[in-house]
Amino acid sequence: MGLGLLLPLLLLWTRGTQGSELDPKGQHVCVASSPSAELQCCAGWRQKDQECTIPICEGPDACQKDEVCVKPGLCRCKPGFFGAHCSSRCPGQYWGPDCRESCPCHPHGQCEPATGACQCQADRWGARCEFPCACGPHGRCDPATGVCHCEPGWWSSTCRRPCQCNTAAARCEQATGACVCKPGWWGRRCSFRCNCHGSPCEQDSGRCACRPGWWGPECQQQCECVRGRCSAASGECTCPPGFRGARCELPCPAGSHGVQCAHSCGRCKHNEPCSPDTGSCESCEPGWNGTQCQQPCLPGTFGESCEQQCPHCRHGEACEPDTGHCQRCDPGWLGPRCEDPCPTGTFGEDCGSTCPTCVQGSCDTVTGDCVCSAGYWGPSCNASCPAGFHGNNCSVPCECPEGLCHPVSGSCQPGSGSRDTALIAGSLVPLLLLFLGLACCACCCWAPRSDLKDRPARDGATVSRMKLQVWGTLTSLGSTLPCRSLSSHKLPWVTVSHHDPEVPFNHSFIEPPSAGWATDDSFSSDPESGEADEVPAYCVPPQEGMVPVAQAGSSEASLAAGAFPPPEDASTPFAIPRTSSLARAKRPSVSFAEGTKFAPQSRRSSGELSSPLRKPKRLSRGAQSGPEGREAEESTGPEEAEAPESFPAAASPGDSATGHRRPPLGGRTVAEHVEAIEGSVQESSGPVTTIYMLAGKPRGSEGPVRSVFRHFGSFQKGQAEAKVKRAIPKPPRQALNRKKGSPGLASGSVGQSPNSAPKAGLPGATGPMAVRPEEAVRGLGAGTESSRRAQEPVSGCGSPEQDPQKQAEEERQEEPEYENVVPISRPPEP
């Protein structure tokens, strides 16, 4: 029962093992048709290793005793046999199953039946037994190499020479034929026995070679050594290392080792004994190394087993190998091993120097420099870390996003960057606003003005537009620039023109020097001033807030305030060089002759005029042409004869001042003022001075704040639109040409209203000559004096005996033509 169950289990185990070991690519390996698709041997084959190479011949195809199965169901004879029953051996020339393979060894050998290898005869050698042997009858050759192996008693390469030795006690060498004696025999042919009591003897001499433990000539005495061996000749004991004595029975004493204990031990630790035979120590003393502790430590090391490094000795010198002490130390160190830093307050070699004062730190023991504590730096460690650094000597940069950290710990300080940003922004915003304000002011000051005075003149009047632009610059500088002398520069012509009838007077242009100006001409109109004063000068117009006439302390203060009245005050009298053609223009215009000075020269009264004896420079300008030249030409107008009245004596110099606005003159006309001034000039003993007052009413008064904003252009447009346009009354032509024989006004002209009486008296005058010239021109300051220094043209400054009719003709020839001036026809004089 048990056996029946065991066999199926064994078969299942065998199949599983075989199936798992088969190679899918092996010979005769097939896949089972079962659903498991396991590997198995094909039909008729049996598994061998991982393949199925054993054929199966079973049943009726089973092979007989001397047959083998070569394929499933096919049997053949064993190799080397043939026949019906496979009982006959193959002939010598065949081999293999059924003797079907031919043997190449025939006829000098036979083939092995299964493999076909040749087996040569005794006298043949080679792979196919093709070589004959040369060993003779007493030798046998090797079938593979052909070397002869001689029989005993024969030697030579062919085994053909007999040996000469005792064959019972020796053998001879096959190559040389020499006899090799067996133990106990000696001699050339080994014919003598040895007498050594069982010990061998030398073959040539027969001397005994005693065995260990025996000594003597014939090895008859036994040695007495406890350890070691005795001498074969004397019997003395040769002790091994670590022992001594006659019989080597004593070990070496402590501290010695070697043969006969002749060597001393090394530096073993605590003087422990070393090994008596080898001399090695279990451990060495400090400073020594090696198995026998006889090697000192290498330079730079010390201690047990030389495992420690020497300290910083002076200049890297080696320390003591056992203690590690240094002979000298580097600066900053003390102690036997130079491991102790200098005491506090000292540094340097042998700590002999005193440290400097370190407020927040310690002194470096080597260099003496201060090593600052965390958060401080500097030569004396008295300065806190700068922003962005922390640590000792402030050498560690902060790693905070905002760049600031605690100077000691390095921790980031939140908000520090924000505070700095706010501080920077608070500083930059006012600066930016100030910059923008300055830029706006510059744009407003330098931008073209939209006032009525900026209205362009007739087409092609480029010079007039340029004059208007220069007027803006002079107006802006008027409140800050005092009267200046232009040193070595000469201004031959200064023309102040206005081209708008609604604005009484404006300074607009300073013409450049003429190309025809003579370098030796003088700018001075006063012969008493001398050549030193002949320098051109100008004065800027006064602004609001100037000192009035009543508060002026002296003529210098009055003159320094300015020479021109402000352009908005047209009623203020001011001195103008004589240009009679201005009276004929549609718009009031003023032209200054060459060499006119605008700065005061001396403290003269308003009545003083330049000397008429000085030769005018207009004669050298005869070739001048153009609009500027025509404006500068001076002619004697007929209105010169319209001033027979004389004014009272001149006022004191302190009465004239600049920067003072006088109120309007009421119902008086400009012609009345001119006649009064001319009459006063004719009666005066000095040179003739012509003073003009332009027609028109002054602008409304304005405060200082409004005046500043008007200069910046804020109120100019609005103010121009709010005011009612008023025209300056144009003087009639007949009034200008009434009297031609009177002394002409060479530098200016006076416009009159058609309804004004030419000889009407001024208010407050006691007669036609009651008003003095100083009172008519009060408030002009330097402008009055500059008019006194203006050079008089020939027609106005010539000899008083000159023919008036001739002067009138010259005036008509030299009279310039002005734009928009239409001559008015008048009836002939009675």
UniProtKB/Swiss-Prot annotation:
This is Scavenger receptor class F member 1. GO terms for cellular component: endocytic vesicle membrane; membrane; plasma membrane. Mediates the binding and degradation of acetylated low density lipoprotein (Ac-LDL). Mediates heterophilic interactions, suggesting a function as adhesion protein. Plays a role in the regulation of neurite-like outgrowth. Residues 644-653 have a biased composition (Low complexity). Pfam families: EGF_laminin. Keywords: Cell adhesion, Disulfide bond, EGF-like domain, Glycoprotein, Membrane, Phosphoprotein, Receptor, Repeat, Signal, Transmembrane, Transmembrane helix. It is found in: Membrane. Its main location: membrane. SUPFAM superfamilies: Growth factor receptor domain. Residues 1-19 form the signal peptide. The keyword Membrane applies. Glycans are attached at residues 289, 382, 393. GO terms for molecular function: low-density lipoprotein particle binding; scavenger receptor activity; transmembrane signaling receptor activity. It is a single-pass type I membrane protein. The modification Phosphoserine is found at residues 589, 606. Residues 634-643 have a biased composition (Acidic residues). It comes from Homo sapiens (Human). Residues 53-87, 95-130, 155-191, 215-249, 302-339, 351-382 form the EGF-like domain. One of its GO terms (biological process) is receptor-mediated endocytosis. Disulfide bonds join 57-69, 63-75, 77-86, 99-111, 105-118, 120-129, 159-172, 165-179, 181-190, 219-230, 225-237, 239-248, 306-319, 313-326, 329-338, 355-363, 358-370, 372-381. Endothelial cells. The keyword Protein biosynthesis does not apply. Heterophilic interaction with SREC2 via its extracellular domain. The heterophilic interaction is suppressed by the presence of ligand such as Ac-LDL. Interacts with AVIL. Residues 20-421 are extracellular. The gene is SCARF1. The chain crosses the membrane at residues 422-442.
